[in-house]
Amino acid sequence: MLSILYFFLGTSLGSFIGLICDRFPEKSIIFPRSHCNQCGHPLRFFEMIPILSQLFLRFKCRLCQSSIPYRYLFLELFCGGILLLYFYNYLDFGRTYLLFFSLCLTIFDLKNKSYPLLIWILGTLPLLCLGNHYLTFSLGISLAVLSYIKRLNIGEGDFLYLASVSLIFPFSKILIAIELACSFGLMYFLVRKNPNETVAFVPF
């Protein structure tokens, strides 16, 4: 029973992350209340139940019948799965939080090829309390500043994200993550349809 509660909490967090990524920074994440993006219909409580409401409504708005993107369902399922892993002790609290934070930045990066600095600051503050690799964190911040000044090929946001990750993971694992990200990024670079498209690094 408790595992179901954790899963439902995770799906709710996933729904909230989706709302943040849809609205911020152009709109308030508090007002107006959740609504259909097409017709503006304010959602009733039974239309905001994660996963179940989408299945019940068959991925369509109750009023205008416009389609609800499947990405919201996948996001809620993924976040529910993360909290289940935490519940069964496959993840500690720090890595669980980092996964949610990374997911939020990933969505922003995929949409805009960047993410709001305020989101990074607010998301990193708890990691400063949870982590202890402050030297590596300082190195990441320094590289971000250098990237901003010199306009390097790797954006400052990528270095800021690596700085956040370094608070939870040691430097050796950060290097492995960079190697894997560069490999996957290169593969995507080679097969992409638009040769002038900027590649978002955080998702990798």
Q: Would you name each region that the model predicts?
A:
Residues 1-204:
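A membrane-topology feature that recognizes alpha-helical transmembrane segments
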